[in-house]
């Protein structure tokens, strides 16, 4: 079945790509969750709109990505989160929390989908986080999680 991706799907492609997948995968997973729509001739207009929106948020060149990487690595990120006595958090730190903390610390605006946590952050202390700016460029930064 031909579908148009509306979001980035690991192993398939990015938003706006037209891909061919098995019928069950499309009907039972991708379409109900909003990751894709069925391909139609009218859907081609949607593809153009999705691609325009993607270009706005896309970092075009490696040079731009390296500039943003330099800015990111100079930012000290601290997150104040509620925690218990033993240093365990109530919940966990999400990529959206990290992206908001980067912005609050004076860093560049980063999309939460670009923030990659190695494993869920559920304890106080220092943690390593990477931000995938370009397929070839990733910024590594330290995030300090403190009790609120």
UniProtKB/Swiss-Prot annotation:
The keyword Cell cycle does not apply. Keywords: Ribonucleoprotein, Ribosomal protein, RNA-binding, rRNA-binding. Disulfide bonds: none annotated. The keyword Repeat does not apply. It comes from the Bacteria. InterPro entries: Ribosomal_bL9, Ribosomal_bL9/RNase_H1_N, Ribosomal_bL9_bac/chp, Ribosomal_bL9_C, Ribosomal_bL9_C_sf, Ribosomal_bL9_N, Ribosomal_bL9_N_sf. GO terms for molecular function: rRNA binding; structural constituent of ribosome. One of its GO terms (biological process) is translation. GO terms for cellular component: ribonucleoprotein complex; ribosome. Coiled coil: none annotated. Belongs to the bacterial ribosomal protein bL9 family. Binds to the 23S rRNA. This is Large ribosomal subunit protein bL9. It comes from Streptomyces griseus subsp. griseus (strain JCM 4626 / CBS 651.72 / NBRC 13350 / KCC S-0626 / ISP 5235). The gene is rplI.
């Amino acid at each position: 079945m031909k579908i148009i991706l509306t979001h980035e799907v690991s192993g398939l492609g990015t938003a706006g790509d037209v891909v061919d997948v098995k019928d069950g995968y499309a009907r039972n997973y991708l379409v109900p969750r909003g990751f894709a729509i069925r391909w139609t001739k009218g859907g081609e207009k949607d593809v153009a709109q999705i691609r325009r929106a993607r270009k706005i948020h896309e970092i075009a060149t490696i040079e731009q990505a390296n500039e943003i990487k330099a800015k990111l690595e100079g930012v000290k990120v601290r997150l104040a989160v509620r925690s218990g006595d033993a240093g365990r958090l109530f919940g966990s730190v999400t990529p959206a929390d990290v992206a908001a903390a980067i912005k609050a610390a004076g860093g560049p605006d980063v999309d939460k989908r670009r923030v990659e946590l190695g494993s869920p952050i559920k304890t106080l202390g220092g943690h390593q986080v990477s931000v995938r700016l370009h397929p070839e460029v990733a910024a590594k930064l330290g995030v300090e999680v403190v009790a609120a």
